[in-house]
């Protein structure tokens, strides 16, 4: 009887040892697979980041909104905008950007002796400057830019041949303009992204500085590779 009990205990101990060993081996295998999966995921993300931000060129375009002061004593008016840009990157972070913008709106001239209300105005800017991309992730990136150039103001296009100055508007002329802002990109693919750009535009029509704020939206296409 004693021998039978001893045999049962030995068998139970052996079975427990087998189960513990099997469970430990299974846990080790799961941990190894999880570690390998995490490593593969990190490697994939790094490859995507490399593929996305090793492009040498970016071309973009879209539309937006600008809050603009059209005369020294006039209220600010809302304008719709378009933008086209091209950027050449020397490395994944530093590049130079050239940009064309246009803005269209109706000036708030109030009551005048000419019986003209809210004449149409437009401005076109041509600027270039450095662009620095300081945040790069698999799907998102943020860059900042500073540009300077020339702005063409057309403030008498809707004034029915009345000089813009007589309506309280800036004179139609070409003046210096400058801008700073941030590009916030969301990448659908390594070569295609949606862009949101909060921006400041400084203009100097009439010999004074106008501080204008706006936001642009659009798409960006990336191509070529940095050598």
Residue spans for each PLM region:
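Residues that define the transmembrane beta-barrel architecture of outer-membrane proteins
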Residues: 55, 76-82, 120-126, 172-178, ...
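Short glycine/proline- and aromatic-enriched beta-strand/turn motifs that initiate or cap beta-hairpins
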Residues: 27-87, 224
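Residues on the lipid-exposed face of transmembrane beta-strands in outer-membrane beta-barrel proteins
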Residues: 61-63, 84-88, 128-132, 148-150, ...
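Gram-negative (and chloroplast) outer-membrane scaffold detector with strong preference
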Residues: 87-88, 92-163, 216
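Repeated loop/turn-to-beta-strand initiation elements of outer-membrane beta-barrel proteins
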Residues: 57, 93-98, 137-140, 186-194, ...
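Extracellular loop and loop/strand-boundary signature of outer-membrane beta-barrel proteins
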Residues: 69-72, 109-119, 163-170, 201-207
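C-terminal segment of classical bacterial N-terminal signal peptides
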Residues: 18-27
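Outer-membrane beta-barrel "beta-signal"
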Residues: 211-227
């Amino acid at each position: 009887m004693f021998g039978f009990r001893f045999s049962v205990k030995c068998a139970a101990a052996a079975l427990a040892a087998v189960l513990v060993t099997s469970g430990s081996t299974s846990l080790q295998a799961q941990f190894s697979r999880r570690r390998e999966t995490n490593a593969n995921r990190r490697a994939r993300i790094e490859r995507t980041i490399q593929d996305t931000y090793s492009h040498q060129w970016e071309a973009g375009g879209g539309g937006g909104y600008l809050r603009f002061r059209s005369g020294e004593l006039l209220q600010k008016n809302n304008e719709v905008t378009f933008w086209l840009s091209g950027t050449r990157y020397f490395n994944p972070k530093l590049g130079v950007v050239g940009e064309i913008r246009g803005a269209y709106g109706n000036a708030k001239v109030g009551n005048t002796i000419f019986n003209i209300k809210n004449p149409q105005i437009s401005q076109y800017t041509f600027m270039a400057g450095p662009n620095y991309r300081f945040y790069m992730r698999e799907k998102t990136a943020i860059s900042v830019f500073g540009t300077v150039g020339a702005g063409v103001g057309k403030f008498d296009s809707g004034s029915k041949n009345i000089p813009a100055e007589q309506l309280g508007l800036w004179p139609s002329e070409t003046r210096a303009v400058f801008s700073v802002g941030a590009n916030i990109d969301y990448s659908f693919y390594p070569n295609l992204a949606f862009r949101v750009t909060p921006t400041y535009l400084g203009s100097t029509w009439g010999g004074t500085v106008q501080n204008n704020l706006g936001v642009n939206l659009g798409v960006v296409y990336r191509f070529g590779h940095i050598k």
